Amino acid sequence: MADYDLAILGGGPGGYVAAIRGAQLGLKTCIIEKDKLGGICLNWGCIPTKALLKNAEVYNTIKNAHKYGIKVDKISVDFPANIKRSRDVSNRLSKGIEFLMKKNKITHIYGMGKLTSKTTIETKSSKKKEKVNAKKIIIATGTRPRSFPGMEI
């Protein structure tokens, strides 16, 4: 069983910022996340969406270039390249967070975490199970929208 002063369950913006701050305060810190660091917004929601919107904005600017006396003969959209760019943007930012974890000597444990006591988290990944003991635990798992009967999302 690994021992830490602080364990963070969840690698989104709440979790990774808390982990960095804990490490800055001198705490032996780990962060438990099943996926890439950064959370839903960075990896699958806000950031990739904004990258795709920027692609659309650039397309629209080129499409209207004639209004500025610029002639463009042919314009087309390469959808796979657009998706690749949005993934590349997200991956670059997530790797930046990984760098900050290493720089601050924070252990990133890949897997799902389950509280088994007030100081113990059992982690499970496709490769292994382990227990983490921590004096303090922060739950920063984010949220999902709740569906109500008759109002499914």
Identify the role of each PLM range.
Residues G15:
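N-terminal Rossmann-fold NAD(P) dinucleotide-binding loop
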Residues M1-G12:
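Beta1/beta-strand and adjacent pyrophosphate-binding region of the FAD-binding site
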Residues A2-Y4, I20-L27, I32-E152:
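Glycine-rich flavin
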